[in-house]
Amino acid sequence: MKKIKERVIYFDMDGTIADLYGQENWLNDLRASKVDPYEKAQPLYNMDMLNSLLFTLRKFGYKIGVITWGSMDASKEYNQAIRKAKKIWINDNLPACQEFHYQTYGTPKHKATYQNIKINKDILIDDNAEVRKMWESKGGIAINPTENLYKELAQLIS
């Protein structure tokens, strides 16, 4: 098994792996500073299958991480509650995850990385086209999760 130079595959959460937007009244709940939508979000993928693939990628030298935003205009206290809820969701649903980065809403995601993404060509999987474009402008690789995520990830080891 040939290991690659360590690179990180980062996942966004909301709308990428967690179905925040599919919940009834999610926006009203966020505006009311409730964490229920984050706690109750259903996975958007078969997480057993996804985690199996991610653990295989780890054997090839990839690290797995999450970079996720809080809610727009959230207070400090609400951001803390969101962070806690999202971390629990990741622990319950994405055990392959090795890094967790929580950012206030709108923070450029490349600012969460420990290294300069231009060096390692770290990968971001995000449903937001604008976020993917910004990531790529900083030298990273971006994947649209709506375009056969399993196939895209499997190609990283073939």
Identify what each model region corresponds to:
Residues 86-102:
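Structural recognition of alpha->loop->beta junctions
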